[in-house]
C-alpha cells in the first residue's frame, strides 16, 4: 500500500476540524483544479504568494488569493446558483455546507510539485471530509474542473522538440491519471462533472513572451491542449456510457478563447495579446511580485488576460455565463444549468 506523503499528513491535520453541520437544503459546488480556480488555498502552502498582493483583487478592492483582478469563474457560478462562494479547503474557519474549493495554484495531474495540492491530493482531501455532506448531497452536487495546463506547460518547457508519438503518449498518460481520479470521486458519490477544457496554451501571453513568438502562438503547447481536450471528451463520453448515473458537461474553452483572440474588438477588448499586469514584451511576468516593477493597465476590462496566464474578471464572467447557459455548440452535451437540475 502506498504510504501517505508528509505533505498529505500535514493536510490531514488541517482538515480534521472541518466536519461542519450543514443545511439539509444546501446546494453543493465542489471545485478542483489549478490557479484558474484557486480562491485562496495557495497561501496556506507557500509564503509571498503573488495573488495575495496588489494589484490582484483591485476590482473588488483587495487581494484575496484569486489570480485575477476580481472574481473567478467558480465565484460567478456560485452566484448563478444562489449559494456562497465555495471557500478554500485549507481555511479551517470556513463553512463548507454549500461546497468547497480544492483547486490550488501550480496543481498538476501527474507528478508531485512542491507547495501545492495535486489533483490526487485534492481528491484525497475530498475523501477525508466527504461525511460533511450526505450521500444525496454528494450525488446532486456539481464537481467543476480546470486542470492539466501545468502538466503541458511543464512538458513543453522540457520537451520543445517532442515528436508526435511522444506527445500522444504523454497526453494518454495524463488522461489515464485524470480518469483514475474521476473514478475515485464517482466512488465517493460524485455524479455530475463539469469541465472547462484547456485553453490554447501556446497563446497565453506568458508563453508568447517566454518563447519569443511575438504575436504568434507556440504550436506545441496548443497542440498538446487540443489533444488533451479531444481525449478528455472521449473519456467522459465513455464513462457516461459505462457508469450508472455519471453525467458530464464540457465547456469548449479552447475554441471560445481562439474566437476572442481572433476578434478582440467584438468582445470589448483592446488586446488579447498582452496582459494587463506584468512586465516584458507581453507584460506577462511579475504581477504581484514584491521585487518586480510591473506595468498595470488603466482599464482592466479592456484586456482578456489580467496577468500572463490568468483571465481578467470580465473574461471570467463571460466564461461563467457560457458554462451556465450556452447552447451545445459551446458547452455540451448540456449546459451547467441543465446539468444541475438533471436527475
Curated annotation (Swiss-Prot):
- Stored Gene3D superfamilies: SGNH hydrolase
Name the family the entry cites: Belongs to the 'GDSL' lipolytic enzyme family.
Q: Identify one Pfam family in the record.
A: Lipase_GDSL
Signal peptide residue numbers = 1-26
Write down the glycosylated positions. Answer: 95, 154, 161, 238, 255
What is the official name of this protein in its record? Answer: GDSL esterase/lipase
Sorted alphabetically, which keywords does the UniProt record give? Answer: Glycoprotein, Hydrolase, Lipid degradation, Lipid metabolism, Secreted, Signal
- Enzyme Commission number(s): 3.1.1.-
